[in-house]
């Protein structure tokens, strides 16, 4: 009983000290007191490597908004998703786990530094990311991108922290960060970036937001709002940001009583990688060319598929032309509409993320 009371008093005493320090830091502009508080390293266990790492849920106690975004992202489900489980024959292929449940991407950075290879780390020979064998359900978790080999959490900002913290703004704002796992897409990016478009992966897939890094008490009182990024990692945010990233256009339409023929022109206008992109998994983009009657019913249709494996993807700045011919039936005198739809799909056609759509009214 005495031991329990002593522990309670210690916790209360530390909490009281922190409250006083927080108030003083706020009043003084957070200068000296911020440095003092950070140097105290109150929770070093948060930055433990290996099985001792407490898990992303622990990070979510303070980084509430970021954790919620990550929890709803595909990164958090990179190991537990049915697609990954089936594709790896129930996790038989360990090579894939290195990126779907990494210890930390800095194992690759460490290897690159030791070998003194002066190239982007994603191209460093014999470098690799180490796979976790613990807490696999978290997939690409917080430590995967933020925990260094020196047991420090790194990121683009500095500030008050109860755990070791290292600022690395340049790396966290570069596509090289994402390229440690998304190797093939990053190589495409290196090939095409600079041709009038210098946007990084983060610019499109991590929407900008101004907020405090943490929302929990009392730490949030020591933080000011900063420009940051949402941790959603979504293709939908990229589409929302660049609504005309790919353009569809009907050209050379030949319209008569017997048939309608023409072309659909596709241009990858604003993306620094191919559409689709990536080496692993089922990645398909579908083009549907539909002929509709005056009631909106599809009476004729043609489908074109684009795969990286077949080298039919649309590269940055590339224009592809797909021809179509629709023979007309006895309703050819009715008003019809041509429609072209471009969307991402998966193997069982449950994913139909719309990329672009164009319509052309026809008078017969």
Where are these regions (language model features)?
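Beta-rich carbohydrate-recognition modules and glycan-binding surfaces
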Residues: 1, 16-17
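N-terminal secretory signal peptides that target proteins for export/translocation
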Residues: 1-10
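A broad structural signal for short, well-ordered beta-strand segments within beta-sheet-rich domains
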Residues: 2, 140, 333-337
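A short, structural micro-pattern
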Residues: 3-4, 136-139, 198, 283
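Short Gly/Ser/Thr- and charged-rich N-terminal loops/segments
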Residues: 13
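Bacterial N-terminal signal peptides
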Residues: 17-26
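Sequence context of c-type cytochrome heme-c attachment sites
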Residues: 30-194
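Short, conserved sequence motifs used for protein processing/export or organelle targeting and
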Residues: 195-198, 203, 207-364
């Amino acid at each position: 009983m005495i031991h329990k009371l002593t522990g309670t008093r210690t916790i209360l005493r530390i909490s009281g000290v922190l409250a006083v320090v927080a108030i003083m830091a706020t009043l003084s502009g957070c200068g000296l007191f911020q440095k003092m508080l950070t140097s105290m390293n109150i929770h070093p266990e948060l930055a433990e490597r290996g099985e001792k790492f407490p898990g992303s849920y622990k990070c979510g106690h303070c980084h509430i908004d970021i954790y919620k975004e990550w929890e709803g992202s595909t990164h958090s489900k990179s190991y537990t998703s049915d697609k990954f489980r089936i594709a790896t024959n129930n996790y038989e292929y360990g090579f894939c786990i290195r990126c779907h449940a990494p210890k930390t991407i800095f194992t690759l950075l460490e290897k690159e530094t030791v070998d003194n290879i002066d190239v982007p780390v994603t191209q460093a020979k014999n470098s690799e990311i180490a796979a976790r064998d613990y807490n696999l359900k978290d997939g690409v978790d917080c430590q995967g991108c933020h925990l260094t080999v020196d047991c420090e959490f790194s990121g683009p900002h500095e500030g008050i922290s109860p755990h070791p913290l290292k600022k690395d703004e340049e790396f966290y704002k570069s596509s090289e960060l994402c390229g440690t796992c998304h190797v093939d897409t990053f190589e495409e990016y290196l090939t095409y970036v600079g041709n009038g478009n210098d946007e990084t992966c983060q610019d499109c897939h991590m929407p900008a937001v101004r907020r405090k890094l943490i929302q929990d008490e009392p730490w949030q009182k020591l933080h000011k709002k900063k420009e940051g990024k949402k941790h959603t990692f979504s293709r939908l945010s990229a589409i929302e940001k660049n609504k005309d990233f790919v353009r569809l256009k009907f050209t050379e339409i030949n319209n008569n009583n017997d048939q309608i023929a023409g072309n659909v022109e596709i241009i990858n206008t604003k993306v620094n990688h191919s559409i689709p992109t990536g080496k692993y998994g089922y990645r398909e983009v579908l083009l549907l060319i539909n002929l509709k009657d005056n009631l909106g019913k599809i009476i004729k249709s043609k489908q074109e598929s684009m795969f990286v494996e077949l080298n039919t993807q649309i590269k940055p700045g590339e224009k592809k032309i797909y021809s179509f011919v629709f023979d007309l039936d006895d309703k050819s005198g009715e008003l019809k509409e041509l429609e072209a739809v471009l969307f991402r799909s998966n193997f069982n056609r449950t994913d139909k993320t719309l990329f672009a759509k164009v319509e052309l009214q026809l008078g017969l």
